């Protein structure tokens, strides 16, 4: 017979009740903690997530400002396109989606690979563009099937179009797709939010330099959407603010005329108003069409441009680096006069060669018979090398560096473009730093005629000439005429006070300008037969930049050497002489081709500006 131990059973039951109660308490504790965590600690997070399901903030892109020439001619257009975009978090099977969309919107393998690449660097909650520039047929096909594709939308956007193509590419630049580097830069500046609705950003030229002004301010719409992502109603609308319109100093008709003269050449021309630095024309040949860059140029096409031996991507006006040659002789003369090295009455005998004192090193003059007795005026008129060898020897490299840097050589000009090279005005310190060698007197002699280590851009040559025209007032070139926002027009204002070289009242300024006039108008001047008939008066200075050095007993013959080893030819000029309205620099790389020569082109440009009815038939060869 079995007896029950009621006390033991009661204790066991109580233990089980206590354990069960403890488990219930723990479960309720966990539940209460989670409720607290969800309702209190993460209230803001889940409220936001909940609102995102039905309340959306849609950024609205601003209209990009238009760029005009000085006469009000629009140089760019804004055109409306449509893209198709996918919001990743709404898509369960991305591969299946892409397969379904391919026949509807004609997706190419490149479209899909670009999209997958963009997915990796994008938030899954933000739409990612699948394809740009949809056709009307593609839009219609998708509209019929749209209800099948939750998370896929078609959006309109504006793109840039450049109707003048290659003619203005180096000035206007272009806009192109915003890439990761752009986003990082925008984020660093606190501007990323302002590009939430944009595809493109300025990458080159005026489009890049004035990006902040042209872009405008992004607006937004607060909308309520259903569970399919369709807009139910508009809750709030903050319209975007359009970008500013920009008027350039450029004259489109002059630009086109100069380009017609340089067709087929590797060349550059800059035309500037010497009174305020306004750029009237900036031509660099050859050029490129900026339109393919807007939607994204192919690697193959970009590679062709990048490796083209004629360098179409380079703006030769601001990035072309050349020994400035004899175009610097007026500024060398001016510097020597200001430093007291020479006077207007100083004379040297211009022999066929000049010998460096204490050596047997001979430096040749371009004129085999020499020039006879020379003062500074005649030396500039005849571009006498031997005179400037002597001047450079007497000045020394330190004074040359100090004076010529004031004319703007060896540093940026201040032009409102990012694409500019500094050039190089050599100095004793530079050679030691770069070449680890001492400076020799022979180096100085070559610098005296704009050769040797010295390299400059055409825009630097014009800046120096503008300083000469303005009695030493150094004026920065610029492309901006004014900015327009609604009815408000803000004209260009230079930053800071222009630098002044020496005394503006010095008579030497006029003396050197007169010598440049003599170069073009005196019978002994090297440009006489090209320019002396101009009724408005031209002052000029030519230059020939060596591509390779000749041996002491070697004679230069352009017809006997390859084209790309021939000398570069420069012309700088200002006109009308008594009241200059333009300062111009022209370069023909390797002396031009197909019978094109520098002096006649310069004369044609000036006649086009000041004597359009003139007969510009000129001699075939430059002196």
Swiss-Prot record:
Residues at the catalytic site: 326
Location in or out of the cell: Cell inner membrane
Swiss-Prot/TrEMBL keywords: Carboxypeptidase, Cell inner membrane, Cell membrane, Cell shape, Cell wall biogenesis/degradation, Hydrolase, Membrane, Peptidoglycan synthesis, Protease, Transmembrane, Transmembrane helix
Signal peptide, first to last residue: none
Entry-linked Gene3D superfamilies: DD-peptidase/beta-lactamase superfamily, Penicillin-binding protein 2a (Domain 2), Penicillin-binding protein 2a, domain 3
Catalytic reactions of this protein: Preferential cleavage: (Ac)2-L-Lys-D-Ala-|-D-Ala. Also transpeptidation of peptidyl-alanyl moieties that are N-acyl substituents of D-alanine
SUPFAM superfamilies, sorted: beta-lactamase/transpeptidase-like, Penicillin binding protein dimerisation domain
Membrane topology: Single-pass membrane protein
Paired cysteines (S-S): none
Domain of life: Bacteria
Pfam families in alphabetical order: PBP_dimer, Transpeptidase
Stored InterPro entries: Bact_Transpept/Beta-Lactamase (IPR050515), Beta-lactam/transpept-like (IPR012338), PBP_dimer (IPR005311), PBP_dimer_sf (IPR036138), PCN-bd_Tpept (IPR001460), Penicillin-binding_protein_2 (IPR017790)
Recorded GO MF terms: penicillin binding; peptidoglycan L,D-transpeptidase activity; serine-type D-Ala-D-Ala carboxypeptidase activity
Keyword Transmembrane on entry: yes
Name of the top EC class for this enzyme: hydrolase
HAMAP family, per the entry: MrdA_transpept
Biological role stated in the UniProt entry: Catalyzes cross-linking of the peptidoglycan cell wall.
Family: Belongs to the transpeptidase family. MrdA subfamily.
Name of the protein described by the UniProt record: Peptidoglycan D,D-transpeptidase MrdA
Source organism: Salmonella typhimurium (strain LT2 / SGSC1412 / ATCC 700720)
Lineage: Bacteria, Pseudomonadati, Pseudomonadota, Gammaproteobacteria, Enterobacterales
């Amino acid at each position: 017979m079995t007896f029950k131990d009621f006390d033991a059973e009661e204790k066991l039951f109580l233990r089980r009740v206590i354990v069960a109660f403890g488990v219930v308490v723990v479960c309720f504790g966990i539940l209460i903690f989670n409720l607290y965590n969800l309702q209190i600690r993460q209230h803001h997070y889940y409220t936001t997530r909940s609102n995102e399901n039905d309340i959306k903030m849609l950024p609205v892109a601003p209209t990009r400002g238009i760029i005009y020439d000085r006469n009000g001619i629009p140089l760019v257009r804004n055109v409306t396109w449509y893209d198709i975009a996918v919001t990743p978090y709404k898509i369960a099977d991305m591969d299946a989606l892409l397969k379904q969309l391919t026949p509807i919107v004609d997706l190419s393998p490149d479209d899909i690979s670009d999209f997958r690449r963009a997915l990796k660097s994008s938030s899954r909650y933000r739409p990612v563009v699948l394809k740009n520039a949809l056709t009307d047929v593609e839009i219609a096909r998708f509209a019929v099937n749209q209800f099948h594709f939750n998370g896929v939308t078609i959006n309109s956007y504006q793109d840039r179009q450049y109707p003048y193509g290659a003619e203005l590419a180096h000035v206007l630049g272009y806009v192109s797709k915003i890439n990761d580097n752009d986003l990082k830069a925008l984020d660093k500046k606190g501007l990323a939010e302002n590009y939430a609705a944009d595809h493109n950003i300025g990458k080159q030229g005026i489009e890049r330099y004035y990006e902040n002004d042209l872009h405008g301010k992004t607006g937004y719409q607060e909308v309520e959407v259903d569970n399919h992502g369709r807009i139910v109603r508009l809750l709030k609308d903050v319209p975007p603010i359009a970008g500013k319109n920009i008027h350039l100093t450029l004259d489109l008709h002059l630009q086109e005329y100069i380009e017609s003269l340089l067709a087929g050449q590797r060349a550059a021309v800059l035309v500037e108003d010497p009174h305020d630095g306004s750029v009237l024309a900036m031509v660099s040949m050859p050029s490129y069409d900026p339109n393919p860059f807007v939607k994204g140029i192919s690697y193959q096409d970009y590679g062709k441009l990048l490796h083209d031996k004629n360098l179409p991507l380079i703006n030769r006006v601001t990035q072309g680096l050349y020994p400035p040659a004899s175009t610097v002789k007026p500024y060398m003369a001016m510097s020597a006069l200001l430093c007291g090295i020479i006077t207007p009455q100083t004379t040297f005998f211009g022999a066929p060669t000049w010998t460096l004192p204490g050596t047997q090193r001979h430096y040749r003059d371009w004129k085999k018979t020499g020039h006879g007795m020379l003062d500074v005026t005649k030396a500039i008129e005849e571009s006498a090398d031997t005179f400037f060898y002597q001047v450079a020897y007497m000045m020394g490299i330190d004074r040359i560096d100090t004076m010529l840097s004031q004319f703007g050589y060896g540093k940026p000009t201040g032009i409102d473009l990012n694409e500019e090279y500094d050039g190089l005005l050599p100095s004793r310190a530079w050679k030691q730093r770069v070449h680890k060698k001492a400076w020799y007197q022979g180096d100085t002699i070559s610098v005296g005629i704009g050769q040797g280590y010295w390299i400059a851009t055409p825009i630097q040559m014009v800046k120096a000439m503008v300083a000469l025209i303005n009695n030493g007032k150094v004026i920065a070139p610029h492309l901006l005429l004014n900015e327009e926002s609604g009815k408000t027009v803000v004209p260009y204002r230079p930053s800071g006070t222009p630098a002044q070289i020496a005394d503006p009242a010095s008579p030497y300024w006029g003396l050197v300008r007169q010598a440049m006039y003599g170069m073009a108008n005196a019978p002994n001047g090297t440009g006489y037969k090209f320019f002396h008939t101009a009724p408005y008066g031209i002052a000029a200075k030519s230059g020939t930049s060596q591509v390779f050095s000749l041996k002491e007993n070697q004679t230069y013959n352009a017809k006997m050497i390859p084209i790309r080893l021939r000398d570069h030819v420069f012309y700088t000029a200002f006109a009308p002489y008594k009241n200059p309205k333009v300062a111009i620099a022209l370069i023909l790389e390797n002396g031009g081709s197909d019978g094109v020569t520098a002096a006649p082109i310069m004369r044609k440009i000036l006649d086009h500006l000041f004597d359009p009815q003139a007969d510009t038939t000129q001699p075939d060869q430059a002196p």
